[in-house]
Amino acid sequence: MAKIIEYDEEARQGMLAGLDKLADTVKVTLGPKGRNVVLDKTYGAPTITNDGVSIAKEIDLEDPFERIGAELVKEVAKRTDDVAGDGTTTATVLAQSLVHEGLKNVVAGSNPIALRRGIEKASDALVKQLVASAKPVETKEQIAATATISAGDPEVGEKIAEALDKVGQDGVVTVEDNNRFGLDLDFTEGMRFDKGYISPYFVTNAEDQTAVLDDPYILLTSSKVSSQQDVVHIAELVMKTGKPLLIVAEDVDGEALPTLILNNIRGTFKSCAVKAPGFGDRRKAMLQDMAILTGGQVVSEDLGLKLDSIDLSVFGTAKKVIVSKDETTIVSGGGSKEDVAARVAQIRAEIEKTDSDYDREKLQERLAKLAGGVAVIKVGAATEVEAKERKHRIEDAVRNAKAAIEEGLVPGGGVALVQAAEKVEKDFNLEGDEATGAAIVFSGIEAPIKQIAENAGLSGAVVIDKVRSLPEGEGFNAATDTYEDLMAAGVTDPVKVTRSALQNAASIAGLFLTTEAVVANKPEPAAAPAAGQDMGY
């Protein structure tokens, strides 16, 4: 495909136009009085959302240089969402602010490389200050307040706090559709591990790209499943029962994988294959954990079991298995509670005995997977569009609450960044363009507060001046239009969300400023309209 190339200021301005189009669309959602954005879909009803990363994903610009600029900001939102589960809009607003201020200085003659170094040093110092000032989460009420802010709904905050209280920090909270109106919370025992389906052809739910198996048989093996003969024998055993099959193995490849996929596509036999988690002895131990949880046996030649001669007695069972691209959740395994309790006691004893910090950490992970359980928040609403939007907000709020438990809380509403900057800036000594880069960060971090204020119908400049005069921890509560102690009022952000937003925004800003040429695909010419046909009259 032919390429088009732009250099210097023209390249940066083209990318900046794309960044602005995306950021201006996303930033209207920031804060408790932010607006929603309606996303048109090719099929089905439109989606209404205030989630930054969901909006960013839907924006695809026509101009190739604008598209590249927008894609870079999408990366900011996506990275922040991946790490912290929230803060995508804050990250986008910060990126826009840093890039605009940075480009002004580049045009004025500043060295882009030195500016980038200054931006990186200032953002690193701010992150250290944020982490040092974070307060640990100690109560269920703090979790509820954090989740409430993320979801914009007190009922959601209470449900998430209750769910995390039941499963613990290491437990799993999932969000599902509900046939009834409102929110329900169910708690089921289960296990989640970080391996997804081997092939996307196993997907049963195209919308969220997951494979959902109801009441499946589960085959656990420490070896590879490669031969067609083995997989046909396994399939014949399970097909007689009319139930789906989950295979957890070292790998599924050779003739076995296409055989499973073909039967899946034809609808002959529903199955899914995933790789076993871990390596070496740890993998064997985790497979044994799964076997105890599901009431099955690990098929291993060490135990004299071969795939071509097994029967149904070695298969485990579960009420449901949900497999995504990256992880697998086994809900309500069919193993006995006594066996699971004995296994948990055994792992706890191993934790007490080990002298290795690494081994202790891995044993604790296994314990959490085996004993943590799964909480399911079921979401129902008046319309499908509303249910989808609410479900998405709850998923973000769950990750937000977990981030708070993990690293602690700071005052919300963008205040933590401004107050951290006031402390860091006093003792920050850089020279030349590096100092200019740091100054870009110290002024750019005001952008989230200003946008929250403007979305609430107030002047951003007036609010930021007032916030700078307040004692530490106090700031602007946009929900009530008051200045108060934000921590006491429950207006908080997980420090993980705030620092991730800043780190990712600073990273992309540095890339923007140091871009000297952009190579883009040349747009295809529009197809000519079809010529009219002679009607034969």
UniProtKB/Swiss-Prot annotation:
PROSITE patterns referenced in this protein's UniProt entry, alphabetically: CHAPERONINS_CPN60
GO CC annotations, alphabetized: cytoplasm
Catalytic reactions of this protein: ATP + H2O + a folded polypeptide = ADP + phosphate + an unfolded polypeptide
Subunit structure: Forms a cylinder of 14 subunits composed of two heptameric rings stacked back-to-back. Interacts with the co-chaperonin GroES.
Record NCBIfam families: GroEL (TIGR02348), PRK00013.1 (NF000592), PRK12849.1 (NF009487), PRK12850.1 (NF009488), PRK12851.1 (NF009489)
Designated name of the protein: Chaperonin GroEL
EC number: 5.6.1.7
Any one GO biological process: protein refolding
Family note: Belongs to the chaperonin (HSP60) family.
Binding site for ATP: T29, L30, G31, P32, D86, G87, T88, T89, T90, G413, N477, A478, A479, D493
Entries under HAMAP family matching the protein: CH60 (MF_00600)
Keyword Acyltransferase set for record: no
Keywords noted in UniProt: ATP-binding, Chaperone, Cytoplasm, Isomerase, Nucleotide-binding
GO molecular function: ATP binding; ATP-dependent protein folding chaperone; isomerase activity; unfolded protein binding
EC category name: isomerase
Main function: Together with its co-chaperonin GroES, plays an essential role in assisting protein folding. The GroEL-GroES system forms a nano-cage that allows encapsulation of the non-native substrate proteins and provides a physical environment optimized to promote and accelerate protein folding.
Any one Pfam family match given in the protein's UniProt record, by short name: Cpn60_TCP1
Compartments where located: Cytoplasm
UniProt keyword annotation of Nucleotide-binding present: yes
Domain of life: Bacteria
Source taxonomy: Bacteria, Bacillati, Actinomycetota, Actinomycetes, Bifidobacteriales
